[in-house]
């Protein structure tokens, strides 16, 4: 817990540490055929970086902060069931949906060109 960053990607904010992997619903900047294994990614939307006891916050993002990582694989999340029923009409509809997600690993966090 000595260093971590809070990033914004895929419509959500994540607390990321180097060497750990995370699931994200979708990368806006990548097309589906670019989501292959070991594709290197750079995330520039870094909201905050903590290194030991110092905290640097952006407004809204930190300038010169980059989170480098690579894609491990694409996967599907757990299936949810949608059930619609209209009473007194004998109308029932049951649907399922699985959200596509991408698993990536964070390799390093950079601030102003230096790895923290």
UniProtKB/Swiss-Prot annotation:
Plastid is among the record's keywords: yes
Designated gene of the protein: rpl21
Lineage: Eukaryota, Viridiplantae, Streptophyta, Embryophyta, Marchantiophyta
GO cellular component, one term: ribosome
Alphabetically ordered keywords of this record: Chloroplast, Plastid, Ribonucleoprotein, Ribosomal protein, RNA-binding, rRNA-binding
GO molecular function, one term: structural constituent of ribosome
Species whose genome carries this gene: Marchantia polymorpha (Common liverwort)
Residues making up the signal peptide according to the UniProt record: none
Chain's role: This protein binds to 23S rRNA.
Cysteines engaged in disulfide bonds, as pairs: none
Origin superkingdom: Eukaryota
Pfam family, one: Ribosomal_L21p
Subunit structure, as described in the record: Part of the 50S ribosomal subunit.
InterPro entries: bL21-like, bL21-like_sf, Ribosomal_bL21, Ribosomal_bL21_CS
Localization in the cell: Plastid, Chloroplast
Family the entry assigns: Belongs to the bacterial ribosomal protein bL21 family.
GO process annotations (BP): translation
Protein name in UniProt: Large ribosomal subunit protein bL21c
């Amino acid at each position: 817990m000595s260093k971590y960053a809070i990033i914004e990607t895929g419509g959500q904010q994540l607390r990321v540490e180097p060497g750990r992997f995370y699931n994200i619903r979708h990368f806006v900047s990548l097309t589906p055929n670019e989501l292959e294994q070991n594709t290197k990614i750079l995330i520039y939307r870094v909201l905050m970086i903590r290194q030991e006891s110092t905290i640097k916050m952006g407004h809204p993002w930190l300038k010169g902060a980059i989170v480098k990582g690579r894609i491990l694989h694409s996967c599907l999340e757990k299936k949810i069931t949608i059930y619609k029923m209209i009473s007194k009409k004998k109308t029932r509809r049951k649907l399922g949906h699985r959200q596509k997600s991408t698993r990536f690993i964070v390799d390093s966090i950079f601030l102003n060109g230096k790895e923290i």
